[in-house]
């Protein structure tokens, strides 16, 4: 049975961190705006935003080596690292504003201070890490980064990693204490509780099946999973924030911007330590370097995590393959996403990305002991009985045509929107949730251009560096970073036991 369309101003599809962030921004800027949220699952933050479905790194390019690449002349390109760091500063500022407003009353529920480290082995990699440090140290956003190749110093920083290490290869690491671990699941749930108090209509157990243009906006077809009833809702603006499920819904809009875009799903696996004594001996997020020929998504890291108030230790990611675009998706997701307008894009990517294909096949075939051997490159004394495999979330790597050619694999997070700004979708993977605030500000700029000028003063009140380069204003960065560190309670360094 179908009902008459019910009207509203804004519809948010998916109850993840992106929709939560956009919803809170809109209610701060336009309190009278009528917003509806539709989520297929039973609660908020259960797919990509869930704390067990992502690495929880506050991505600020402090330790992730794939954001700093070496040019042919040996110099280090830090432009991507600077962009990612600037983006994370915007997220920190907005979260700080919400802490002051008591929307996020206890910062420790969703963000914790943790050193971010990069670690490499081998003379060539040590040279690269030194050059990276020199390039980043000249930038105010990366102040306080230390470098060491002294084994005694490294034993203090990362005792678990150095214990039992017998390799003759030189080893080096950088360390910066201003890193964070973010529980995006907890953050998402708190923000949706707040939106509910602001009279946002949140519909769990409601899966969006179709979108079509109507006068003045979009009509969406929704299946109420609880009573198997079809509903129709209309809105002037629709945001598709459904994680891996965003691409199929974007395709249903039929907008020109949705053409020549495909997606390839990659599932993630982590090893989680079940021995609390071992987890207590490590206190950092330590990122290594992807092996030659491996894609950026394969960067191995050993992470201290704070989940449900408990300190955990995870290692990964390992890639798996599933044709599903969501952990709770369908095995038909991949095949049904191939359309006449993107089949050549997908085929071109398949031909170009043989390295990725080889990597995925090798990863899928790994045994538990082979995964443990990869962990032992970080923790030489790791015992199989102390670790379990956990399945993390699905990532859909975007494939699209670019001026450089067909079928280019995209790494990053991007907004695809209609020319008239009436619909926008969030696609991509890392840095993902860390960039929720800057990416949703981009949605506001693209989709609410008429209202934006009148909103800018309020945005700057919430996010003081909005529209300003922090790199070009180091004094402003120092001031804002100190303020957000204090407000978010990120000053307590915890010793390694």
From Swiss-Prot:
SUPFAM superfamilies: FAD/NAD(P)-binding domain. It catalyses: (S)-malate + a quinone = a quinol + oxaloacetate. One of its GO terms (molecular function) is L-malate dehydrogenase (quinone) activity. Its EC number is 1.1.5.4. Its cofactor is FAD. NCBIfam families: mal_quin_oxido, PRK05257.1-1, PRK05257.1-3, PRK05257.1-4, PRK05257.2-1, PRK05257.2-4, PRK05257.3-1, PRK05257.3-2. Belongs to the MQO family. This is Probable malate:quinone oxidoreductase.
């Amino acid at each position: 049975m179908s009902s008459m369309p019910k009207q509203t101003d804004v519809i948010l599809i998916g109850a993840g961190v992106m929709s939560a962030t956009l919803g809170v921004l809109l209610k701060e800027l336009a309190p009278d705006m009528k917003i509806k949220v539709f989520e297929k699952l039973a609660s908020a933050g259960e797919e990509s935003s869930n704390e067990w479905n992502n690495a929880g790194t506050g991505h600020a390019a402090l330790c992730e080596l794939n954001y700093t690449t070496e040019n042919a002349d040996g110099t280090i390109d830090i432009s991507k690292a600077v962009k990612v760091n600037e983006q994370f500063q915007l997220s920190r500022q907005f979260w700080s504003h919400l802490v002051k407003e008591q929307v996020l009353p206890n910062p420790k529920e969703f963000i914790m201070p943790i050193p971010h480290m990069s670690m490499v082995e081998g003379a060539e990699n040590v040279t690269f890490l030194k050059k990276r440090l020199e390039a980043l140290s000249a930038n105010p956003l990366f102040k306080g980064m230390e470098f060491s190749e002294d084994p005694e110093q490294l034993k203090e920083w990362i005792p678990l990693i150095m214990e039992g290490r017998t390799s003759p290869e030189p080893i080096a690491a950088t360390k910066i204490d201003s890193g964070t671990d973010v529980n995006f699941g907890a953050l998402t749930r708190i923000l949706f509780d707040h939106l509910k108090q602001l009279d946002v209509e949140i519909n769990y157990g409601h899966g969006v099946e179709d979108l079509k243009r109507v006068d003045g906006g979009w009509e969406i077809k929704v299946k109420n999973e609880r009573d198997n009833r079809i509903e129709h809702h209309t809105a002037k603006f629709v945001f598709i924030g459904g994680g891996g499920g965003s691409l199929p819904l974007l395709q249903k809009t039929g907008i020109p911007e949705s053409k020549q875009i495909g997606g390839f799903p990659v599932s993630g696996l982590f090893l989680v330590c079940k021995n609390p004594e071992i987890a207590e001996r490590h206190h950092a997020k330590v990122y290594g370097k992807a092996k030659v020929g491996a894609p950026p998504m394969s960067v191995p890291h050993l992470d201290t995590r704070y989940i449900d108030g408990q300190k955990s230790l995870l290692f990964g990611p390992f890639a798996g393959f599933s044709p599903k675009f969501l952990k709770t998706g369908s095995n038909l997701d991949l095949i049904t996403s191939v359309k006449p307008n993107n089949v050549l894009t997908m085929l071109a990517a398949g031909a170009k990305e043989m390295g990725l294909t080889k990597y995925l096949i090798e990863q899928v075939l790994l045994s538990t002991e082979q995964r443990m051997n990869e962990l032992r490159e970080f923790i030489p004394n790791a015992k199989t009985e102390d670790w379990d495999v956990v399945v993390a979330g699905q990532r859909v790597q975007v494939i699209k045509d670019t001026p450089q050619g067909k079928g280019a694999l995209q790494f990053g997070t991007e907004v695809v929107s209609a020319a008239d700004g009436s619909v926008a979708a969030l696609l991509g993977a890392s840095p993902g949730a860390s960039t929720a605030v800057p990416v949703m500000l981009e949605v506001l700029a693209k989709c609410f251009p008429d209202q934006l000028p009148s909103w800018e003063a309020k945005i700057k009140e919430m996010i003081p560096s909005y529209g300003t380069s922090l790199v070009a204003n180091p004094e402003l960065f120092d001031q804002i970073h100190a303020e957000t560190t204090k407000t978010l309670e990120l000053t307590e360094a915890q010793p390694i036991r």
